[in-house]
Design a protein with these regions (language model features):
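Conserved catalytic or regulatory cores that recognize and/or transform ribose-phosphate-containing ligands
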Residues: 1-128
């Protein structure tokens, strides 16, 4: 979900809405919201200059992506967001399935090289 360059309250609201929608549609998925990860960072991080703060947020996001995620979901606008494009590259490099959501926060497609997991995800979202 693109976060930079928009009001933080808007991004937080979108993140909560997406988590709620995906959790309702896919109750066995554990949804990790990047804004929740950032919220858990030490208070000092929030006082850093913008570029260092962004680096800390992205570092925590990447740590969660590589350490906890079985797949990564992307909302509309992901391809114009530097952070989202970085996450897409990481998902490609580490063979994590990429789940793309449409404007209604519904899964529109699943891509990836881990075919067993992609097939499982496609079955779950009725994409086969």
């Amino acid at each position: 979900m693109p976060i930079s360059g928009r009001p933080i309250k808007e991004a937080i609201a979108e993140g909560k809405r997406i988590v709620k929608t995906l959790s309702a549609a896919h109750p066995n998925w554990e949804i990790i919201n990047p804004l929740d990860i950032s919220a858990g960072l030490p208070k000092e991080v929030w006082d850093l200059p913008e570029r260092k703060r962004y680096a800390a947020f992205m570092g925590a996001d990447i740590e969660a992506l590589l350490g906890e995620a079985d797949a990564v979901a992307f909302t509309m606008g992901a391809l114009v967001s530097k952070g989202c494009r970085l996450e897409i590259c990481l998902a490609n490099i580490y063979n994590l399935p990429r789940i793309f959501l449409n404007a209604a926060d519904k899964v529109s497609r699943v891509e990836g090289t881990d075919m067993a997991l992609c097939i499982e995800l496609r079955k779950e979202i009725n994409q086969e």
